[in-house]
Design a protein with these regions (language model features):
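Sec/Tat signal peptide C-region and signal peptidase I cleavage site
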Residues: 15-19
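Long, structured stretches of catalytic cores involved in phosphate-ester chemistry, encompassing
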Residues: 21-85, 89-613
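Positively charged n-region of N-terminal signal peptides that target proteins for export
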Residues: 1-5
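Bacterial N-terminal signal peptides
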Residues: 6-14
């Protein structure tokens, strides 16, 4: 798998016999630490600092004797002083404790198991092992009837009952909800100790990114139990609309003019700075931000600061000309009607004409020098034991849907290249189980806002695959022909459910962590709490779901859930007591356990056994 490489991050790994706090450090950690990229011999730690500088991590197996250390330097202001360090040389399946030097910011983690420790030539030659993970979506911390409250009670439950029992987590979209998006570059410059002449290039070209950075800091500061969770549990993430902007559609639709659509790359850049670093990515080329010279009626884009011949555009997304207003990233329906830059739209790059010149489609509408960006591809894959996980990007390449024509054969949720990557990866997989992680739902439509105030006025709402039926049905038919089970893990809708699509294909939606629940009769196509359901050409079986009746006031729809997934591959059968001798099940099992987020009580469990009719 390919991991995001932070080339500007300087690592200084320095194991010491007796690591200890030195003199007070001038660099203060303001956010984090957070854990990611778990492996059997390493773990990555993320922090943000008040200024660029060195951070030292003390760690060890004994909580009271952190005898090793690893130092690194955070990145510059263009990344909001964020950075990561990967601690290598760790023992597999082992609990480590750590603390940031000269801080009270501490945590712990367990490395992933290693196949070599479970191999048994006669009973488990491949070294399969068991593991668990938690997944859900929707961390909305807002009050006023938008959530379970700013205290984020689910994370109290997770910290007390779950974190020591799992190997990792997947936050399947909407980790972030929009706050502070109107934070100004001037406020940010003061915060980071820079004058206007020192403004980083990214802030010059995309000034509204500072509001997204502040949005992340706002949630990390107010969500102390959330921050505690991330200090102990390595997490993978998908980016959904709220990481970018609520109800963002059509970012892959050439010619589409929409304020929200063209905020994609700004939100995505901030997501990589704060969360996306933790993910494996198939393409590691970052987005390009620039200032374009456009001429009315011309299909030429010029940028004297660019060298397009050095950009591998086949590994990048399409081009957006930004809206250009200070409130471009604020989720407010009234702002959608306010004009942006006259050339703001979604563009296709037709040809590179030279280092500084592109041919684009459509043609420019006006003379101007607007800000623009060429987007980043955000999907990737990782493997744990006999399970492959495909993390999809359901927002970057999405064409404009049509609720009245959901079978449009040209409509796409993930784009042709990502679709091919997904099918090729699954076709070539040697694993027993396939997990496809989609931030949006597969069989149930998302056609209502749950009574929220902010709505996308330009198009009828449906975030789900139910308005991309050709692509969805192509995937279901492909998956159903495999000799392995496929589990589509979804989020977005603020309800949990377990759905059997075919004998081989299942959808499991988990959440919300803290957001208010949707009312299925209004927001989810009138689906039942369980039983047969058909929305579009295919019927499915809803085995169980969380549910909110339509007569419950919005502020009272607080039924948060989370799901713990347990993969049972092996059992221990030692000759002597307390020994280890692992045998692989002929038919491994995956158990999905849905829990009440307030109490941790088990609400539903579904077990799939591989290879049994």
């Amino acid at each position: 798998m390919n991991y995001l490489l932070t080339v500007t991050l300087l690592l200084f790994l320095s194991p010491q016999a007796f690591a200890q706090d030195g003199k007070p450090t001038p660099i203060r950690v303001t956010d984090g630490p957070m854990l990611g990229r778990p492996a059997s011999d390493s773990m990555t730690i993320w922090v943000r600092t008040d200024r660029q500088g060195e951070v030292n991590v003390l760690y060890g197996r004994n909580e009271n004797k952190l005898n090793l250390s690893s130092s690194f330097r955070t990145r510059g202001a263009q990344f909001d002083y964020t950075g990561t360090v990967t601690i290598n040389g760790l023992e597999p399946n082992t609990r480590y404790y750590y603390r940031i030097e000269d801080h009270q910011l501490d945590g712990s983690f367990r490395t992933m198991p290693s196949a070599k420790n479970f191999k048994n030539p006669n009973g488990n030659p491949e070294g399969l092992f068991n593991f668990r993970f938690e997944f859900a979506c929707g961390n909305n911390p807002k009050g006023s009837g938008d959530s379970a409250g700013p205290t984020l009670p689910v994370f109290d439950t997770l910290n007390k009952q779950v974190r020591e029992k799992i190997n990792f987590a997947i936050l399947n979209g909407d980790w972030l909800y929009e706050t502070r998006r109107d934070y100004s570059p001037q406020e940010w410059l003061y915060q980071v100790g820079l004058n206007e002449a020192e403004t980083p290039r990214i802030v010059q070209k995309a000034p509204t990114i500072v509001g997204v950075w502040q949005n992340y800091k706002d949630l990390l500061h107010r969500g102390r139990n959330l921050s505690e969770w991330h200090r102990h549990v390595p997490t993978y993430f998908t980016a959904d609309d709220h990481e970018l902007i609520n109800d963002i559609y059509g970012a892959g639709e050439t010619g589409y003019v929409n304020r929200r659509a063209v905020f994609r790359d700004i939100g995505t850049q901030a997501w990589f700075d704060y969360l996306g670093w933790a993910n494996p990515t198939e393409h590691n080329i970052p987005a390009w931000f620039g200032a374009a010279k456009l001429t009315k009626g011309s299909d030429l884009l010029e940028d004297e600061d660019a060298d397009f011949t050095k950009l591998d555009l086949d590994q990048m997304a399409n081009l957006h000309v930004h809206w250009g207003t200070p409130t471009a990233g604020v989720p407010d329906s009234a702002l959608d009607a306010q004009p942006g830059d006259p050339n703001s739209a979604v563009y296709e790059i037709e040809e590179i004409l030279g280092p500084n010149k592109l041919r684009i489609k459509p043609k420019a509408k006006a003379d101007g020098r607007p800000a623009y960006s060429i987007g980043r591809r955000c999907y990737g894959k990782f493997t744990v034991s006999n399970c492959d996980f495909f993390l999809l990007d359901t927002r970057t390449h999405r064409s404009l849907h049509n609720v009245d024509n959901p079978g449009n054969p040209k409509a796409t949720m993930i784009g042709a290249k990502q679709l091919k990557w997904l099918k090729d990866g699954i076709r070539d997989s040697k694993s027993d189980f396939i997990f496809v992680v989609s931030s949006v739902n597969f069989m149930v439509p998302h056609v209502g806002s749950g009574g929220g105030d902010d709505k996308q006025a330009a198009i009828k709402k449906d975030d789900a695959w139910t308005v991309f039926l050709k692509e969805r049905e192509e995937l279901i038919e492909f998956w159903d022909g495999l000799d392995k089970s496929v589990f589509v893990l979804t989020g977005d809708l603020h309800n949990s459910f377990a759905i059997k699509i075919t004998d081989n294909v299942y959808e499991f939606a988990s959440g919300p962590h803290n957001s208010i629940n949707h009312a299925p009769m209004k927001d989810e196509g009138g689906r039942p709490s369980n039983g047969k359901f058909k929305y579009g050409p295919r019927s499915c079986d809803i085995r169980w779901s969380s549910y909110a009746m339509a007569d419950i006031p919005r502020a009272n729809r607080t039924f948060p859930h989370y799901c713990v997934v347990q993969v049972n591959n092996v059992f221990n059968n030692p000759v002597e007591r307390d020994g280890e001798r692992w045998f692989a099940f002929p038919h491994p099992q995956v158990i999905f356990q849905f829990h009440d987020a307030f109490t941790g009580e088990l609400r539903y469990s579904e077990t799939i056994v591989q290879g049994l009719d």
